[in-house]
Swiss-Prot record:
The modification N-acetylserine is found at S2. This is Hemoglobin anodic subunit alpha. It comes from Anguilla anguilla (European freshwater eel). Belongs to the globin family. The keyword Metal-binding applies. The gene is hba.
Amino acid sequence: MSLSAKDMAVVKGFWNKIAPKADEIGGEALGRMLRVFPQTKAYFAHWKDTSPNSPEVKKHGALILATIGDVVNRIENMTTVLGSLSDLHAFKLRVDPANFKILGHNIMVVICMTFPNDFTPEVHLSVDKFFQNFTLALSERYR
């Protein structure tokens, strides 16, 4: 599913609201994923604590949202922007790409909870399409 110019504009505009709370949203989304989908903890076995409020979860969640923010800023070149990260996840970390969809879903849940009045059906559609494309781009090196 490709992103239209309107979708890109909606995502970029909405990201301006998300950006000031990105660290908090990232930590909450990653913590939620680890709790609701405990099988994802296997990728973080080297952490001492994978509970939702642990410093490791919060720090990595913030890093994830910072990366997504970078992708939003260069949304037209998503696959190129995510190339090295796709290599890392495919060849070194060996993360099952199905987990990217799970994380995207959890990020959308937290965004919706954080901005209930702003997460309109139009925004939901565009953000969902963005995360579908993000997942495909991050999975590019798996092919």
